[in-house]
């Protein structure tokens, strides 16, 4: 603010802009050579798809359990979505992925680590290799997380991270695209809106790579500004790791307090999944929609607001594939339909104490017990 340099590009004194410094720091955090900062994670997914060569009309696979920016990125790229079913633990169904890849001919997968739930990434990588699929990871909910010691965002062709206010690093809004592919990085920088200032980037490929792309890559003006970058940069490194530890502590407190609640399940997390749980999901299997609405109302009456993925209408941030009518005819996803019908979602603010988590669990248990008793 003191410098007045809120835009990342222009004549400078040779110093890295805050955006370029953020790109360099985040690339180093993940051990990757390239990072491109954009104005949102949705923009980073769109740019990743374009930079990977996805053309209008191309089939792109994507797990159906996600939030609206993912189908939005597919629509923005003009892709034809091929939605993949989910398992009971909310992760992508790898058997259905193989079936859909073979039947559709799709060669790109936009994988959403929705609400921080990470599938078996080793097996997924094998499936992608077997089917000739390029993997792009939506890591909006997994900054700092990984599978078997390897960070999300580093398993495929590109990873896309969010800096939106409810994510693991908060600059209000913003997206970070990471890759080890120099051509994808150069194209992403040019698509983001670098003009011919790409040399000012902090984690970029060599000039020769840009020469291959700079004359035939449009400027979409999706770049990040210096203000959100300046907010995000200090939150990386030790602070990011500390927040992950604190979120997981709260997840442990609440999941343990909910364990054994009649009519409620919290999926087990595999030992290989190094999650960062900024939210908690649970299922109410077999409970009728009216009963779930009653449960939610009882919780809300005691100050606990829970989101529900089985609602007929989209609400707030919450929607499911049946609501995305811009995709055309709804795709049949039988297991997801059953799972989403009872799926509930709660954020875990870092201000929660262990007694707070116990109190939340008590509200959930008591409210659900009332609903189940009324059905008996």
Language-model features, listed with the residues they occupy:
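Conserved PLP-anchoring active-site segment centered on the Schiff-base-forming lysine
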Residues: 48-102, 299
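Phosphate-binding glycine-rich loop
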Residues: 7-13, 17-59, 73-77, 83, ...
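N-terminal "arm"/small-domain region of PLP-dependent enzymes with the aminotransferase-like
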Residues: 1-12, 213-216, 347
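Conserved PLP cofactor-binding pocket of PLP-dependent enzymes
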Residues: 196-208, 253-256, 294-333, 338-343, ...
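Active-site region of PLP-dependent enzymes
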Residues: 142-148, 155-278
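Active-site phosphate-binding strand-loop segment of PLP-dependent enzymes
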Residues: 89-171, 176-184
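Conserved PLP-binding active-site segment of the aspartate aminotransferase-like
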Residues: 162, 270, 277-288, 309, ...
